[in-house]
Amino acid sequence: MNFNATLIGQTVAFIIFVWFCMKFVWPPLMNAIEERQKRIADGLADADRAVKDLELAQAKATDQLKEAKVTANEIIEQANKRKAQIVEEAKTEANAERAKIIAQGKAEIEAERNRVKEDLRKQVATLAIMGAEKILERSIDPAAHSDIVNKLVAEI
């Protein structure tokens, strides 16, 4: 094997080229590659974090929706209970008012009935006395009249 100066020159030039590349070209390339890798890793981490945040937000939204439905059902149930209570109170009040009106009516009827009975008793007593006077054709003294009226009223 024969080494000539061209081969040695090429070897020296290649070594200088490799040293130059290692010193000036390789570090910026490695920095660019590392920076790119870091950005990609950060992007993937951000994407994973965003996916987790999205899942968390969806779970939270689902929970809030369930809570809202439960709350709405509770409100509807309370409203139905209140409605039933109001209807029951209205029925109770109406029944009480009806009973009161019926009692007043019965009391008025009873009072009117008693008044009419008393008037009829007086009229019957007066008619009986008038009939008796006509039959006897004489006038009864006031004491006897009063006594007869009282007896007739008691009998009637």
Curated annotation (Swiss-Prot):
Keyword annotations: ATP synthesis, Cell inner membrane, Cell membrane, CF(0), Hydrogen ion transport, Ion transport, Membrane, Transmembrane, Transmembrane helix, Transport
Transmembrane spans: 7-27
SUPFAM superfamilies (alphabetical): F1F0 ATP synthase subunit B, membrane domain
The keyword Transit peptide belongs to this UniProt entry's keyword annotation: no
GO molecular function: proton-transporting ATP synthase activity, rotational mechanism; proton-transporting ATPase activity, rotational mechanism
InterPro entries in the record: ATP_synth_B-like_membr_sf (IPR028987), ATP_synth_b/b'su_bac/chlpt (IPR002146), ATP_synth_F0_bsu_bac (IPR005864), ATP_synthase_B_chain (IPR050059)
Primary subcellular site in the record, as a coarse category: membrane
Subcellular location: Cell inner membrane
Membrane topology reported for the UniProt record: Single-pass membrane protein
UniProt cross-references to Pfam families, sorted A to Z: ATP-synt_B
Transcription regulation found in the keyword field: no
Domain of life of the source: Bacteria
Cysteine disulfide links: none
GO cellular component: plasma membrane; proton-transporting ATP synthase complex
Function: F(1)F(0) ATP synthase produces ATP from ADP in the presence of a proton or sodium gradient. F-type ATPases consist of two structural domains, F(1) containing the extramembraneous catalytic core and F(0) containing the membrane proton channel, linked together by a central stalk and a peripheral stalk. During catalysis, ATP synthesis in the catalytic domain of F(1) is coupled via a rotary mechanism of the central stalk subunits to proton translocation. Component of the F(0) channel, it forms part of the peripheral stalk, linking F(1) to F(0).
Subunit structure: F-type ATPases have 2 components, F(1) - the catalytic core - and F(0) - the membrane proton channel. F(1) has five subunits: alpha(3), beta(3), gamma(1), delta(1), epsilon(1). F(0) has three main subunits: a(1), b(2) and c(10-14). The alpha and beta chains form an alternating ring which encloses part of the gamma chain. F(1) is attached to F(0) by a central stalk formed by the gamma and epsilon chains, while a peripheral stalk is formed by the delta and b chains.
NCBIfam families reported for this sequence: ATP_synt_b, PRK05759.1-2, PRK05759.1-4
Homology family: Belongs to the ATPase B chain family.
Protein name: ATP synthase subunit b
